[in-house]
Swiss-Prot record:
Cross-referenced Pfam families: ATP-gua_Ptrans (PF00217)
Record flagged with keyword Kinase: yes
HAMAP family cross-referenced by the UniProt entry: Prot_Arg_kinase
Protein name (record): Protein-arginine kinase
Catalytic reactions of this protein: L-arginyl-[protein] + ATP = N(omega)-phospho-L-arginyl-[protein] + ADP + H(+)
Gene name of this polypeptide: mcsB
A GO term, aspect molecular function: creatine kinase activity
One biological process term in Gene Ontology: phosphocreatine biosynthetic process
Gene3D superfamilies: Glutamine synthetase/guanido kinase, catalytic domain (3.30.590.10)
Keyword Oxidoreductase applies: no
Amino acid sequence: MKNWINEECNKEDIVINSNISLSRNLKEKPFSNKLNEIEARENVGFIYQIVKSELKDESCIYQLWNEDKELINSYLDKQLISKELIKNKDKTAFVLNSEETLSIMINEDDHLKLRCITAGFDLETAFDNITKLDDKIEKRVHYAFDENLGYLTTSPTNLGTGMRASVNIHLPALNFNDEISNFSKGLTQIGMDMKGLYEEGNKAYGNMYKISNQVTLGLTEEEIIDNLKGAVLNVISEEKKFREVLLTKCKYDIEDKVFRAYGILTSAILLSEKECTELLSSVRFGVELSLLDISKNKLNKLLVYTRDSSLQNYLKRKLSNKELNYERAKFVRAILAQN
């Protein structure tokens, strides 16, 4: 399975990665929010022993109460864990496979949240891998399940299959034409959700968006995936149409934006987190339009490792704001200079 950060993808592919999550609870235990600290940590140990024996490759557990903040947040940047897991760090943990494509969050909103993330637009591969692991675990434990409601979860929106499917997608042309809000409203009407991958004060930046299903009750896993695929394919089609319009009407402006961004990234001494993300979006746009020849795995690595927490975790030291901006620019220059 392809790690979305390291694997090379089609340069014209505007879907960054695909993600499938399954929420599960153990029948004999209270929900995670009802467990005290001792009970929650016992649950971590119990689940880890099961998961460890079912993962064929090497796995590693991270108990959040024992881990460095920047290390934890670096896995949030890689999209392997959730903000909800971090909020209850005295009770939570997560397990990763060696490829960092499978994550098992323990005591998040539910006892288990199984997540698989893979490169590009490939929901089927993510689904196949996560269901295989889920089936193995289900043979070892009793999941909380109701014949009418399906898998029982803390959130009513996860009842049924307990599955969330999502893709992260790059939409600079739709954003440029102020069409994001219209598409977001349209997706909501068909049971989908669309939000910015990176936000500052509830305002999205970087042209990266997450599209996911909102409801699982009454739908099969296959129906959820098919519905999401249909919605995403429509968004991709519209994004490409708007790109053609931009290249026809604003060719020089687009080229200037792309090459100006590349020039700044290859020469800047200081880069803030937000500015870097926005410039990387412009360069990614240039790659997708065949204006620049840069590998997607390079851009994905930069997207992740230029986040404040990931950069500090990579350098293994805490940095002031000025040091962060200096080291970020230095890191970007070094990666882009590689053959």
